[in-house]
A protein has these predicted regions:
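A short beta-strand micro-motif
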Residues: 11-19, 43
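Short beta-strand-centered aromatic/proline hotspots
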Residues: 23-32
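Short aromatic-glycine-enriched beta-strand elements
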Residues: 37-42
């Protein structure tokens, strides 16, 4: 039987930016765990509505948007 892994706590709904001056994005749900233990999280670009997958470790390094 496959092991069930609970996704980490993700700040869903928070608005963050890619680095200090990058575009803003809204944090979505955890999608899947990667082989290195990191997680992919769905993010939605505030300006365009486009969605993308983003590593959780990068998400926690990004500042909250101003």
């Amino acid at each position: 039987m496959p092991e069930v892994i609970a996704p980490p706590l993700i700040p869903v709904g928070k608005i963050k930016s890619f680095g200090a001056f990058g575009p803003k994005y809204e944090v979505g749900r955890a999608l899947r765990q990667l082989e290195d233990g990191d997680w992919l999280v769905e993010v939605k670009m505030v300006e365009t509505g486009e969605t993308a997958e983003y590593r959780m470790t990068h998400l926690f390094d990004d500042p909250e948007a101003r």
